[in-house]
Amino acid sequence: MILVTGANGNLGSATLAALHARGATATGGSRTPGVGVRRLDFDDRVGMDLAGVSTLVLVSAGFAEDDQVIGRHAAVLETASRDGVRHVVYTSLTGAGDHLGFALAHRATERLVRTCGLPWTILRNGLYAELFGGLLMWAGDGVESAFGDGALAAVARADLAEAAAIVSADPARHDGSVYELTGAPITAADVAAGLAVRHRAIGLEEYRRRLLHEVPGLLPFQPPMLSSIATGVRHGFLDGTGTDLAGLLGRPVSDPLAAAVAAASAMRPGRVRTTAGSVPQATA
């Protein structure tokens, strides 16, 4: 049986759905389980149970400080080794993102995966197209961002979920592989054009100020994380493409621009509350 962690999150639920669509025997794990999902709380080392799981899809629990994330991942990997899991598939971060504020937890987890004693596969996911679109801020009759003219090799989340399903359904074929799963470059101006509005660039200082002073509810690690994405895109560090994703899918990657436009459109004034803080998670 395949178990997908974070089954109530966006990537986890999409991966589980993709596995079921392929006819795979799969279930989800979550600290808040529902129908067809078993309880799996990374903070409950004693209560964690992976008995009967042959392949574990470890969706990064990256929405926390590094020490918490790494500790949680270490706990589930220890449980996997104890309970007889035979393969671990980890959803990591693209290698181009090593400078990002949340990269260290991914690289530390990759080290844990490689040394846990189990066969493994690492999926280095590019940033979601949905994230890129969701980070644009509506202002008047247009959108603003700190991305400047930079491009992001964005990926539709559904493509990453399908890739995870393909790998976990036949893990032996992908044993010891590290895949760089990036998409096609898009810019904030491209998204604005798809929305039929204008894009206005703001500086990184102004963006950080808004995150720190105008956005309620952000956790302490979020402003530097989001600022690191903005400067990475703005200065051309996240626009590199590759062929791994299309190779796994056996088809061209989905259009990331369409996904980004849809995400930005969902933030349009009058549909939801729109502030710089209405931001999606980078890894879920």
Briefly describe each language-model feature range:
Residues 36-39, 201:
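Conserved residues in the N-terminal Rossmann fold of short-chain dehydrogenase/reductase
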Residues 38-54:
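Conserved Rossmann-fold cofactor-binding substructure of NAD(P)-dependent oxidoreductases
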Residues 74-77, 157-165, 242, 256-261:
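Short, amphipathic alpha-helical "lid/cap" segments that border enzyme active or binding sites
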Residues 249-284:
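Amphipathic terminal alpha-helices
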